[in-house]
A protein has these predicted regions:
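Solvent-exposed, low-complexity segments and loops of surface/extracellular structural proteins
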Residues: 131, 138-144
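Signature of Asx- and small-polar-rich beta-strand/turn repeats characteristic
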Residues: 1-87, 91-96, 101, 105-128, ...
Length: 205
């Protein structure tokens, strides 16, 4: 730099093209049924409150919105429904689909430990499991008898769409966007979604 023109303490921003000769491809890893609790606080920023039209998921590259639950009470957390299970044969995996032998209900597993939390496929009004069911995991093949079924918070998944955060030239933070015709939630939210975790590297191939 020229001290006469810029002075000795000047800060200069240089914009230019570089050639990187050693680059590594990033790897995506599927992460299923990640949970995000959304509650109102005194200093919450936009995108972090249940009543915001857009709610940030806090990470990029989400690819499926599994479920959104509304506690309908600002003082209590939203919850998924749960199954208390009898003897389990095999090992269930998080995010896999389970099917009820009697009811025909289908759901995604959020937590594999009993009581097993889950999200019904089909959203509000979908057929739920019963105590007559033996559930079977689609990918694991694990089975278990259902001892009891506990209802979760109100399902409001249909009130939102998923913005994956993927843009033409960068990955933005993913978010859920409330539909213009949908009413604002009344309580705290629980959002369940699938996303891709990114490894270290320079680009996606």
């Amino acid at each position: 730099t020229d001290n006469t023109i810029l002075g000795s303490g000047a800060k200069v921003k240089f914009i230019g093209t570089i050639l990187k000769t050693s680059v590594a491809s990033k790897v995506k890893t599927t992460q299923l049924c990640k949970q995000l609790k959304v509650a109102t606080g005194a200093t919450d920023a936009f995108g972090t409150r249940p009543t915001d039209e857009q709610i940030s998921l806090g990470r990029a590259d989400a690819f499926k919105l599994v479920g959104v639950f509304d506690s309908e009470d600002t003082s209590s957390d939203a919850t998924t429904p749960e199954l208390t299970l009898g003897a389990i044969t095999g090992t269930f995996t998080r995010g896999e689909q389970i099917t009820g032998s009697s009811s025909g209900a289908k759901a995604r597993i959020v937590d594999t430990t009993s009581p097993m939390s889950y999200v019904l496929e089909g959203g509000f009004g979908a057929t739920d499991f019963t105590t007559s069911d033996t559930i079977t995991g689609t990918s694991s093949g694990a089975t278990a008898a259902v001892s009891s079924v506990t209802s979760g918070s109100k399902v409001i998944t249909s009130s939102f769409t998923l913005d994956t955060g993927q843009r033409d030239n960068f990955y933005d933070i993913a978010r859920i966007v409330r539909k213009k015709t949908a009413t604002a939630p009344r309580g705290r939210l629980l959002v369940v979604y699938d996303f891709f975790a990114h490894s270290a590297g320079d680009f996606f191939s």
